[in-house]
């Protein structure tokens, strides 16, 4: 009987790997990628925040900030803990209520939190668990119970990560949405205490939802699958034809490198990379290309004086010999093509902003402010990392029912240097959200192209339809001019000459900015002011992401987000009010060096493939256990045949001026 899931544990799964216990309830199985996702009432949630905080204080549950949780995770790398402790560390990313892990093997409670007797019992019990850690027997039957159920699998213990994997079960009745803030801390903390008291390991409860496709694009196919290590739903992205050409190899390596560095509430992060089934594939694949060149060189050096009549038969025999050797060593050509697919696991969200916009549900002005604030907040994180997204659109903005938004899809993203504007392709950004300089063939552009896209999305949220919906690039440019007026020569300094002449031939046209007030009945002066600054024709005059975040229109959105939605702010048991982070809109901790892009451009296909392979193999697997594709899964046939978007499904190409 074929198993139901696409992912399974890798064949070389370590027998002593430990997995965290996962206690699931009906309220924890939330959301799927569907257009019916209902958003929380932000105003009601904000009004109930104070009473909920008081409830937390009465229960005496410790809450710690994010940076202490990070320190706890670092300490965990040095000390193997009981699976229930691992569960607390993983869950701590979303619920800041767990005891701090010291660098000593013992689990020490925080001194600044009033502790209940249950916490002292937990402390003593965890100490006993750590002392008995080396004496526990490995659960060798776990792979037999779980391995056949999942699409991916794991190998050996390593680092512990945190996930944000939510998906609705369409077979279950939808729960009334509640913002997952401090009131849920009591429930999760009690579950953690009960889990720590269990003397025996319990395997994670598998999600019963079937694996299914949830989206595809020009560079990949995304499936919703179950991670057998945790039982959670995650997104599996399949990127085919990685080594088809040098440009494709660079794009995939760039995307994986970026996703691995993201740690932000509003940017999708990488959970894991599936290691190749054949670890020596890259070396064997390289030999396919190198060996013929060596044989050909030797052949040519020996057959120069020989008649051409003998050349073709010898070459044919040589090629036949190569393929026989590859078959003899178990490396078939078709198998090599199969291995050019790269699989990555990311967080799974419930829906995206496009589905929310076209749905019949109500979008209040509070929702608009919170969404726009989060888009700009995530964009600041990317721009400070020297990354241009170059495809900001509602479909690439994932949303959960709690209104958390994450920027995704970095297939077109690349690093850049603000001090040295290099030529880049203008075939980026979906047409409806493409900045005018890109429409006019500019090759040197900045992060202002992302800012323009945010302005288009802002207007789309207000009026619930696309702002500039044109059939082609020329009509798109004309719609922009109809709104903003004819640009000056200075505003078109990055455009190509053909585009400039086209605009000037049309004659001058006055701006029509007053039409922005008709986007919605709730459009205010502040909203129009921010829109106008986001939609400046001249990219040098367009507002920066930092300036946009400080705009008065987004003050309420910032307050709502950091009152009950973010992970950077926290609440202490002995402090009645929420403690806000000093950096509400954080920057990237380690920006990409612009030299990295230049160095990568000098690499050959073989060198780049070697670097990519080394990066994948050196990266520790999530939970310390690697995964692989399960060919026995019932969904494997459909998964293997799923392909990227065809040329006819893609947006029109930019105008060739």
Swiss-Prot record:
Residues 208-554 form the Protein kinase domain. GO terms for cellular component: cell cortex; cytoplasm; nucleus. Signal peptide: none annotated. Its cofactor is Mg(2+). Its EC number is 2.7.11.24. Component of the beta-catenin-lit-1 complex (also called the lit-1/wrm-1 complex or the wrm-1/lit-1 kinase complex) at least composed of lit-1 and wrm-1. Interacts with wrm-1 (via N-terminus); the interaction is direct and activates lit-1 kinase activity which leads to the phosphorylation of pop-1. This promotes pop-1 interaction with par-5 and translocation of pop-1 from the nucleus to the cytoplasm. Interacts with pop-1 (when phosphorylated on 'Ser-125'); the interaction is dependent on the beta-catenin-lit-1 complex. One of its GO terms (molecular function) is metal ion binding. Coiled coil: none annotated. Belongs to the protein kinase superfamily. Ser/Thr protein kinase family. ATP binds at residues 214-222, 237. This is Serine/threonine kinase NLK. The active site is at 391 (proton acceptor). It catalyses: L-seryl-[protein] + ATP = O-phospho-L-seryl-[protein] + ADP + H(+); L-threonyl-[protein] + ATP = O-phospho-L-threonyl-[protein] + ADP + H(+). Pfam families: Pkinase. Gene3D superfamilies: Phosphorylase Kinase, domain 1, Transferase(Phosphotransferase) domain 1. It is found in: Cytoplasm, Cell cortex; Nucleus. Has a role in the Wnt signaling pathway controlling the asymmetry of cell divisions during embryogenesis. Operates in the AB and EMS cell lineages influencing cell specification. Required for body wall muscle development, endoderm development, pop-1 asymmetry and T-cell division asymmetry. Component of the beta-catenin-lit-1 complex which promotes the phosphorylation, down-regulation and subcellular relocation of pop-1. Regulates plp-1 nuclear localization in embryos. Plays a role in male tail tip morphogenesis. The keyword Secreted does not apply. Keywords: ATP-binding, Cytoplasm, Developmental protein, Kinase, Magnesium, Metal-binding, Nucleotide-binding, Nucleus, Serine/threonine-protein kinase, Transferase, Wnt signaling pathway. One of its GO terms (biological process) is Wnt signaling pathway.
């Amino acid at each position: 009987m074929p198993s139901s899931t696409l992912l399974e544990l890798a064949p070389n799964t370590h027998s002593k790997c430990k997995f965290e216990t996962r206690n699931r309830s009906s309220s924890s199985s939330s959301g799927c990628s569907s257009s019916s996702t209902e958003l929380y009432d932000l105003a009601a949630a904000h009004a109930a925040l104070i009473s909920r905080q008081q409830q937390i204080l009465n229960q005496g549950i410790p809450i710690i900030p994010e940076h202490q949780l990070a320190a706890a995770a670092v300490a965990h790398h040095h000390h193997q803990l009981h699976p229930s402790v691992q569960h607390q560390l993983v869950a701590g990313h979303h619920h800041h209520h767990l005891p701090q892990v010291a660098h000593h093997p013992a689990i020490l409670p925080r001194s600044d939190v009033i502790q209940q007797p249950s916490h002292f019992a937990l402390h003593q019990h965890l100490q006993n668990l750590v002392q008995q850690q080396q004496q526990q027997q490995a659960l060798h039957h776990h792979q037999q119970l779980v391995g056949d159920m999942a699409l991916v699998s794991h190998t050996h213990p390593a680092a512990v990560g945190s996930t944000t994997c939510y998906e609705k079960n369409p077979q279950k009745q939808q729960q009334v949405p509640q913002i997952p803030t401090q009131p849920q801390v009591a429930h999760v903390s009690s579950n953690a205490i009960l889990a720590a008291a269990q003397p025996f390991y319990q395997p994670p409860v598998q999600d019963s939802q079937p694996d299914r496709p949830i989206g595809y694009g020009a560079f990949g196919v995304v499936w919703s699958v179950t991670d057998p290590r945790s039982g959670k739903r995650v997104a599996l992205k399949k990127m085919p034809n990685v080594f088809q050409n040098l440009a494709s190899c660079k794009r995939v390596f760039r995307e994986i490198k970026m996703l691995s560095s993201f740690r932000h509430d509003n940017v999708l992060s990488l959970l894991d990379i599936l290691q190749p089934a054949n670890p020596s594939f890259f070396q064997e694949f390289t030999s396919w290309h190198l060996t013929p060149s060596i044989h050909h060189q030797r052949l040519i050096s020996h057959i120069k004086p020989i008649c051409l009549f003998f050349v073709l038969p010898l070459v044919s025999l040589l090629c036949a010999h190569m393929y026989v050797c590859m078959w003899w060593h178990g490396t078939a050509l078709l198998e090599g093509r199969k291995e050019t697919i790269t699989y990555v696991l990311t967080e799974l969200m419930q829906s995206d902003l496009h589905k929310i916009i076209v749905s019949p549900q109500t979008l209040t002005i509070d929702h608009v402010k919170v969404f726009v604030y989060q888009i700009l907040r995530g964009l600041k994180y990317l721009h400070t990392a020297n990354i241009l997204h170059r495809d900001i659109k509602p479909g690439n903005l994932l949303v959960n029912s709690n209104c958390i938004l994450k920027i995704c899809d970095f297939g077109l993203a690349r690093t850049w240097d603000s001090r040295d504007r290099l030529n880049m392709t203008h075939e980026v950004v979906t047409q409806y959200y493409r900045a005018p300089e890109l429409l006019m063939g500019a090759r040197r552009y900045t992060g202002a192209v992302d800012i323009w896209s945010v302005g288009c999305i802002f207007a789309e949220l207000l009026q619930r339809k696309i702002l500039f919906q044109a059939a082609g690039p020329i009509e798109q440019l004309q719609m922009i001019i109809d709104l903003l007026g004819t640009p000056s020569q200075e505003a078109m300094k990055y455009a190509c000459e053909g585009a400039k002449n086209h605009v000037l031939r049309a004659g001058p046209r006055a701006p029509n900015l007053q039409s922005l007030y008709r986007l919605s009945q709730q459009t205010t002066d502040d909203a129009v002011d921010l829109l106008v600054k986001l939609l400046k024709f001249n990219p040098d005059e367009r507002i920066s992401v930092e300036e946009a975040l400080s705009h008065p229109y987004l003050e309420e959105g910032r307050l709502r987000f950091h009152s009950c939605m973010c992970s950077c702010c926290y609440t202490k048991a002995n402090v009645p009010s929420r403690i806000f982070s000093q950096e509400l809109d954080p920057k990237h901790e380690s920006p990409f060096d612009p030299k990295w892009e230049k160095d990568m451009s000098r690499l050959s296909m073989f060198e780049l493939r070697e670097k990519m392979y080394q990066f994948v193999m050196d990266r520790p697997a999530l939970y310390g256990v690697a995964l692989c594709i399960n060919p026995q899964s019932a969904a494997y046939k459909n998964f293997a045949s799923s392909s990227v978007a065809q040329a006819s499904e893609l947006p029109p190409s930019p105008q060739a001026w």
